[in-house]
Structure formats: structure tokens, C-alpha cells
Amino acid sequence: MKKKWVIRLLWLLVLAVAAIIFWFSSQNGEDSTNTSSGFISFLLRLLVPGFEDKTNKEKKLILSQLHFYVRKGAHFTEYAMLGASLRLLFHVLNLRRPILWAWIAGTLYACTDELHQMRVDSRIAMWQDVGIDSAGVLVGALLVTLWLWHRRKRKRT
């Protein structure tokens, strides 16, 4: 009974992460840019002393320089979360080669995400994002694998 509860919870986690990714992909180009810019501004105010004292022109320049990297980092991170949750689910389901299945499922979701973005106003599909997303899935799955291995190793000693 406990295992069924864990499986349901992990399915819910996978679906929640997929829904968050879908929500971000559903934002039109302007909203997506505003979300990214707001996040970057928040981080800069938090981490860079004197950022608030810069002129608006200097702030915009810094934002534009970081925008690409933050967006790609967000892609990688959200898909790492998907890969980690898929890997945990497949572990509990006792699938053979759970890393491979997590990577395949996450990469297929990344492909459908790019197709979805083609249908959103002022958004385009960028197929190199699938590569970034796929790498994120793999890293997330590998991190969970390392955690499970470490946990199992500690139980033996």
C-alpha cells in the first residue's frame, strides 16, 4: 500500500514539473521576456552591490548581456527537475535502465515543448533548446542516481 502511495506522489511530482514547463512555454514572447528580466533584476539586486545605483542604461545593458544565459540556464534547470522526478518514479516502478527511460521521456517532452512554442504568439521553436533540455534531463537523472547509490551504500555500512 505504501508503494502505491509513493508512486502516485511521484506521478504527481512529474506532472507538476511538466505543467510548470508547459506554463512557462505558454507565455507569449513579451511575457516570457518580462519574467526573465524580472528574475535577472531580482538576482542582480540581491547579489551585485551597487546595482541599484547604476543608470537605467547600464542596467539594461547588464540585463541584455545576461538574458541569454539565464534563459538557457532556466531551460536546463527545469528539465533537470523533470529528469530527477522521472528517474525517481522509474526507480520506484523498478524499471530496467531507469536513467535511459527518464532521458528518453524527458527529451520527448522537450520536443513537444518546442512544437508547442511554435503555436504561441511571438515565440519560436529553437531546436538547440531541445539539446539543452535533454542535457538537463540527463543531469537530473544522474544526480538522483548518485543520491540513490550513496543512500544504498550508507545503509550497508
Residue ranges and their predicted role:
Residues M1-T77:
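"…centered on the first transmembrane helix and the immediately adjacent amphipathic helix/loop
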Residues V6-L9, L93-W103, R123-W127:
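Membrane-helix interface segments
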Residues L9-W23, I104-T112, A135, V139, ...:
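Lipid-exposed faces of alpha-helical membrane segments in multi-pass integral membrane proteins
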Residues G83, R87, H91, V137-W149:
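Hydrophobic transmembrane alpha-helices
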Residues R154-T157:
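Short, charged juxtamembrane terminal tails flanking transmembrane helices
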